[in-house]
């Protein structure tokens, strides 16, 4: 299963075609289509299930995403972060399991050595937050993770199996400090 509270809520846009269970990311507002969203930071108070979101332009909001009145406040706060011409935020959705890009519970594992190699190649320090990974590993050679498919490793009591590579999208081209496109990480 995924990590607790990882991508537990998402904002569906007005053109979403949601079905019970897992839904593809194209149904939700996301950084690939709305770069300003990449500058949103989040913190969760597990006891109250309240989430605080902060953005350098939109400011800060604290909401309980499961409460209908709070959902309206959240949608109103998020709307200015969506570019003109894009489907507007319409509903807060709770997935029950992590709403990742795969239709099975998953955890994304990336390598700090690969990040350092890409940063060097691009001539800039790239933030780990561009990739929204669950786990960052150190000690491997750059790009070694590409050969990990089929491998298993232990993390505490959990055993993780690498089943596929992550296909990256344009969200990684956005500076998470500013929400502005900066650098072609996909080249």
Positions of predicted regions on the chain:
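Metal-cofactor-dependent catalytic cores
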Residues: 1-187
């Amino acid at each position: 299963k995924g990590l607790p509270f990882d991508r537990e809520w998402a904002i569906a846009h007005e053109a979403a075609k949601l079905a019970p269970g897992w839904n593809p990311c194209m149904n939700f507002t996301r950084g690939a289509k709305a770069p300003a969203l990449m500058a949103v930071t989040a913190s969760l108070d597990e006891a109250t299930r309240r989430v605080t979101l902060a953005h350098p332009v939109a400011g800060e909001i604290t909401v309980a995403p499961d409460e209908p009145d709070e959902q309206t406040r959240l949608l109103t706060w998020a709307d200015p972060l969506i570019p003109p011409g894009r489907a507007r935020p319409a509903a807060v959705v709770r997935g029950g399991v992590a709403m990742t890009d795969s239709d099975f519970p998953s955890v994304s594992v990336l390598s700090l050595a690969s990040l350092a190699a890409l940063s060097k190649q691009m001539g800039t320090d790239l933030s780990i937050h561009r990739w929204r990974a669950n786990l960052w590993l150190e000690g491997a050679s750059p790009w070694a993770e590409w050969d990990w498919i089929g491998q298993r490793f232990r993390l505490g009591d959990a055993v993780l199996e690498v089943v596929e590579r992550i296909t990256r999208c344009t969200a990684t081209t956005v500076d998470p400090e500013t929400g502005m496109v900066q650098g072609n990480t996909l080249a």
